[in-house]
Amino acid sequence: MTDPKSYKDTVNLPKTNFSMRANAVKREPELQKFWADNQIYEKLSQENPEEVFVLHDGPPYANGSLHMGHALNKTLKDIINKYKLLRGYKVRYVPGWDCHGLPIELKVLQSMKSKEREGLTPLKLRHKARDFALKTQEEQAKGFKRFGVWGDWENPYLTLTPEYEAAQIGVFGEMALKGYIYRGLKPVHWSPSSQTALAEAELEYPEGHTSRSIFAAFPIIKASKDTEEILQPFLNKLGVAIWTTTPWTLPGNLAVALNPDLNYAVVEQNSDVCNYQYLIVAADLVERLSTTFETELTVKATLPGKALEHTIYRHPLYDRESEILIGGDYVTTESGTGLVHTAPGHGQEDYMVGQRYGLGILSPVDAKGNFTEEARQFAGLNVLKDANEVIINELKEKGSLLKEEAYQHKYPYDWRTKKPTIFRATEQWFASVKGFRDAALTAIKTVQWIPAQGENRITPMVSDRSDWCISRQRSWGLPIPVFYDEETNEPLLTEETIKHIQTIFAEKGSDAWWEMSIEALLPDQYKADAHKYRKGTDTMDVWFDSGSSWASVAKQRPELKYPADIYLEGSDQHRGWFQSSLLTSVAVNEIAPYKTVLTHGFVLDEKGHKMSKSLGNIVDPNVIINGGKNQKQEPPYGADVLRLWVSSVDYSSDVPIGKTILKQLSDIYRKIRNTARFLLGNLHDFDPKKDTVSYEELPELDRYMLHRITEVFTEVTDAFETYQFFRFFQTVQNFCVVDLSNFYLDIAKDRLYISHPESIRRRSCQTVLAIAIENLAKAIAPVLCHMAEDIWQFLPYETPYKSVFTAGWVKTSKQWENSELSASWAKIRGIRNEVNNALELARKEKAIGSSLDAKVLLYVPEQNLRQQLEKFNPADSLTGNHVDELRYFVLASQVELVDSLDSIKNADYHSESDLVSVGVIKAEGEKCDRCWNYSTKVGEFKDDPTICERCNAALVGDF
């Protein structure tokens, strides 16, 4: 007896060298080298046919390693840029770095021994700081490139370069000449820990700050004209009650502020905690304050707030008289007493009241946060350490303290040193926002904000903000180009002095301020008086540095444009870079520096917690890409999985990441890759030039698939156009898994493997596969750039395009759209799902192994659908187009449309829905050795007795 014939070599199995495993650690750098060697980005950014597109980079700080926030931010930018490149835009992306400022200065100082610090001149410190910033910038650039980010890495912008600094001086100069820059004694956020003024954007408000809050009474010594009659009976024992969370500011008290729209009451209190039998408080607060003071307060008289204006009180700690004055709407009954202790040297609102009434500015605190001699008995005490205790004790002794309690609230901390700040009045340079606030608010309305609530965030910030303190008392920064008259202390700041400094900085950089003499730094007309001047020692706020990038980069570089198309940063930048850029641009040019502003949230761990070393929950992007020390626990996923994560999240709010999420994304990545591999493998012998089947000749299944491809890639395009990348993620995942793997490719295997290689049955399927793989590669390219390029390099046929990125965006045809076809195939897919349920029941009972072991019975009550299905169920396998058949759609050897439910109920296994009732019985005939389908014709062919009629025809080229 002879061995049965083997048909293994007659089956068209997939062939491709496209690896199932990404091997990203090795492969991704190879693909990045391919892009670099072929200058793909450079050529596209110059030669693309559409207009220039500029996403202007918000500069990360050149300090420390890259973290997940960097990864989210830079990848989002790169997704947009790569999409725009594929759409034919000349994308010009110049990465930038913020290089000045305190954090770098502190890092440098911390790295030095105390002996080294002793002889440290500003110039030496600046050289060390520059070296540190440049080294960090190089390391960060390497990391960004490994993420797959494209840009002009050879010519980044750094805020420390001469050309940048000179352009920034230009912005400062134009603002100064318009009268927007002034010097003044004003309370500013002051950091005693770093001994400099801070901008709002340099503050953070950690949870859990507890202050010592006090209620105190100041003795009334003279009633105002309007209250004489009412207050006279109580005067000798009357105090005005105030509340404060900063007792240390009491030495600076110069007024008490009230709300003119509130009513106030004189109340009697009968405890002996303080010297005053009678107190003035807001009438609405009497009940609450009775509870707080733990004593009954009895109302003796009420009076309108306005009437109390100019009532005189004595300071409880000094022999100093002050007045009760009208404050603003910040005086409320939400907390406190309805009367606010006012120290114009220690608060913005207090300062405004002081200005209105011509009060002085008393701020008896030095740069380290210690009281000066002006505070008399408290001189030398530190306001954040021991001052509160001493002041509270003295108030107690004087009989002024009503109550002390702990108060938990948000309090500003220095974002770098993580230590509390204070309000302190100092001589500083300011940008007067008042002069261009309305123009800024108008400019905000011209911008597209994504998400839309971004506009609601930045608008009140700009409309409510105080003047911008732009000076810093540090060495590592761009010097404010001002000279002071030695005798009068008057600043010298003119168009000529600014222009002269700008020219010097453009050539030599800002070190020249320290290196050159005053005479050399002054223009000709002032040189003779050089001996009368000294240089200023203040540097500019780093937010003025980065906020000038529109001028130093977007406007200055000829290949870019201003305003930029888009700015994209974290939501904290509404009070940071978005705002500083807006203010400088509006001040100088009366326009916003951007057309669109897109913001993203922060990266949290899987449980929604902030990442911190102390919690041990930090996810390192480098570990995601290259793996950790223990590669079993922290496998190397490569940059594409990281990029896929970025596309998967709704970045408009805070986004989680962790091991479980990465594992899930890795699985999805693998599914997309395996789908691509199947497509490539089944195109190994396909040449689109000669083997493509025309649309008219395609079977209905293939035409339906082209309709789905049109739907899918229209949705993907819209997702990118609207920056909703999570829609791209969901659509592509669904397309690869549900439309392709679980449906079309599942059905296609029979056509691809067992048909004659040249048959239209196979070539029509390959036509669809080629369209699917090319469009899939292009569609994933903005996100999974490495996988997309890898796919393109393994296309088994020639294309005119060297790279997926030079091939342009997805291409579909209007001809493929067919909504009627789509509706009828939605029903067929519903039937297929129901059949799968019934087959699964049979499989569980071990009645069948493969679905090909089954014959499927279908009962379809809807007449139209039944008629449609009948045309998909030819009498035998060799009539029809060999594709549009129910048996192939449901992966069974035979299908019978039955006339009654009884046949279904008599079947071994059944499943029912409104659409269809399904029965499963054993397939008829014998199993074909070649295609594994059952057929009653197996055994009829003398030369090939073990195969079916389809395979017999396929072997001679007829199927």
Curated annotation (Swiss-Prot):
Cofactor note: Binds 1 zinc ion per subunit.
The keyword Oxidoreductase is annotated on this UniProt entry: no
Protein EC: 6.1.1.5
Function comment: Catalyzes the attachment of isoleucine to tRNA(Ile). As IleRS can inadvertently accommodate and process structurally similar amino acids such as valine, to avoid such errors it has two additional distinct tRNA(Ile)-dependent editing activities. One activity is designated as 'pretransfer' editing and involves the hydrolysis of activated Val-AMP. The other activity is designated 'posttransfer' editing and involves deacylation of mischarged Val-tRNA(Ile).
Gene3D superfamilies: 1.10.730.20, HUPs, Ile-tRNA synthetase CP2 domain-like
Pfam name, any one: tRNA-synt_1
GO CC annotation terms, alphabetical: cytoplasm
Motif ('KMSKS' region): 610-614
Binding site for Zn(2+): 928, 931, 948, 951
UniProt short sequence motif 'HIGH' region, positions renumbered to this chain: 60-70
Cofactors (names): Zn(2+)
Residues reported in the UniProt entry to bind L-isoleucyl-5'-AMP: 569
Name recorded for this polypeptide: Isoleucine--tRNA ligase
Quaternary structure (record): Monomer.
Binding site for ATP: 613
UniProt similarity note: Belongs to the class-I aminoacyl-tRNA synthetase family. IleS type 1 subfamily.
Catalytic activity reported: tRNA(Ile) + L-isoleucine + ATP = L-isoleucyl-tRNA(Ile) + AMP + diphosphate
PROSITE patterns in the record: AA_TRNA_LIGASE_I
Free-text comment on this protein's domains from its UniProt entry: IleRS has two distinct active sites: one for aminoacylation and one for editing. The misactivated valine is translocated from the active site to the editing site, which sterically excludes the correctly activated isoleucine. The single editing site contains two valyl binding pockets, one specific for each substrate (Val-AMP or Val-tRNA(Ile)).
Top EC group: ligase
Family matches, as NCBIfam families: ileS
A single BP term in Gene Ontology: isoleucyl-tRNA aminoacylation
One function term, GO molecular function aspect: zinc ion binding
UniProt KW Metal-binding keyword: yes
Lineage, opening ranks: Bacteria, Bacillati, Cyanobacteriota, Cyanophyceae, Oscillatoriophycideae
Keywords: Aminoacyl-tRNA synthetase, ATP-binding, Cytoplasm, Ligase, Metal-binding, Nucleotide-binding, Protein biosynthesis, Zinc
Compartment annotation: Cytoplasm
